């Protein structure tokens, strides 16, 4: 997914970070404090940047409908930088406090129209006994979806296109609680709320999405395995406010999902670590629309599947690199009323890349700086 931000990325996150720093108890002269700077850079090739269907790819490559596309090429090379600032306090006896602010983005070699920026805030409280509470917020000011048909648009001249740039702002708030169980088992429960607000012309697509998630994992020193199950319920506005009832699309949906993630360490020598990971994801979405004119969403069911594998190497303690490959597919099954020539909504996407990240301690009390700690 990609987006382009043009306004200040959620200053409320900065205010919240300052409030958390004041709220979290910090002992005077505590030697367990530190301030870390994290940097990262990912470069990746994407075979289907905006997840177009086969019908849309044919239209784009033929040049028969240039008004329906704002990209130069359907595949592209993307650069994704990341910068974070994290404050951590170790109070002893298993109590840890963490506040992290992170900024990230994605910038494309040819398709600058799909560039994006985002900011996030994380507050984590760890307790003895392997308990952990995490609160997080994420702000994406402007996400470019694609060109969509605007039935309410009035072109200045006859024959001009009614396709418009569809983009939205996305805000996410989440909470999760992780608990260690007897042996190597861990369990985590989480909740997430997403709010999408589209630009004028596509207000009927505004939505709020609830997501509940449960995960169970097994963690060893050199291997880990985790399974997740989730359920999503997206409620769309489905009205654009023009006073005409029933003529707008309803993009609301509901359905289950989940996945399995595994990690294993192949080799270690000194500070060097070599590890591999594999993740499988699946999701089923049943659209809620019951409108006669909304043939693209009425009685529609989507089935999405993704697989990702990676190879990670760490040469120094706080720097590492990861090569990865990801394949994602979506099978959109439309209702009987949909036109045979309608865009099927299915897509196939490959993504392969290389990611680097490193962490540098900017500050810690003198007493702690002289000691050593395991990262």
Identify what each model region corresponds to.
Residues 37-43, 79-89, 103, 121-127, ...:
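Residues on the lipid-exposed face of transmembrane beta-strands in outer-membrane beta-barrel proteins
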Residues 41-49, 89, 103-109, 137-145, ...:
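Transmembrane beta-strands of outer-membrane beta-barrel pores
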Residues 230, 346-375:
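Outer-membrane beta-barrel "beta-signal"
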């Amino acid at each position: 997914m990609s987006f382009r931000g043009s306004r200040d990325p959620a200053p409320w996150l900065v205010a919240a970070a300052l409030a958390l720093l004041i709220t979290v108890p910090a002992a005077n002269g505590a030697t367990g404090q530190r301030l870390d700077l994290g940097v990262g850079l990912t470069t990746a090739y994407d075979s289907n940047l905006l997840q177009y269907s086969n019908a849309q790819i044919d239209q784009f490559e033929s040049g028969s409908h240039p008004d329906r596309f704002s990209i130069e090429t359907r595949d592209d090379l993307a650069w994704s930088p990341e910068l974070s600032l994290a404050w951590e306090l170790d109070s002893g006896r298993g109590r840890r406090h963490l506040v992290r602010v992170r900024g990230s983005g994605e910038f494309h070699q040819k398709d600058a129209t799909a560039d994006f920026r985002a900011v996030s805030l994380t507050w984590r409280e760890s307790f003895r006994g392997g308990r952990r509470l995490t609160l997080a917020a994420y702000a994406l000011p402007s996400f470019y979806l694609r060109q969509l048909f605007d039935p309410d648009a009035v072109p200045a001249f006859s024959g001009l296109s009614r396709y418009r740039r569809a983009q939205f702002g996305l805000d996410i708030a989440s909470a999760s609680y992780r608990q260690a169980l007897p042996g190597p088992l861990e369990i985590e429960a989480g909740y997430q709320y997403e709010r999408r607000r589209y630009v004028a012309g596509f207000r009927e697509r505004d939505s709020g999405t609830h997501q509940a998630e449960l995960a169970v994992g097994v963690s060893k020193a050199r291997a880990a395995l985790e399974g997740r199950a989730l359920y999503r319920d997206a409620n769309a506005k489905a009205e654009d406010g023009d006073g005409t009832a029933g003529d707008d699309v309803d993009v609301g949906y509901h359905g289950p999902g989940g996945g399995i993630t595994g990690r294993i360490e192949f080799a270690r020598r000194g500070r060097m670590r070599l590890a591999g990971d594999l993740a499988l994801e699946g999701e089923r979405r049943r659209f809620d629309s019951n409108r006669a004119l909304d043939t693209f969403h009425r009685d529609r069911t989507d089935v999405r599947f993704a697989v990702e594998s990676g190879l990670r190497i760490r040469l120094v303690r706080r720097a590492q690199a990861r090569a990865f490959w990801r394949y994602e597919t979506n099978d959109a099954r439309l209702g009987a009323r949909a036109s045979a020539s309608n865009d099927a909504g299915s897509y196939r996407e490959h993504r392969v890349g290389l990611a680097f990240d490193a962490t540098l301690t900017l500050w810690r009390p003198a007493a702690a700086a002289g000691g050593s700690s395991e990262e």
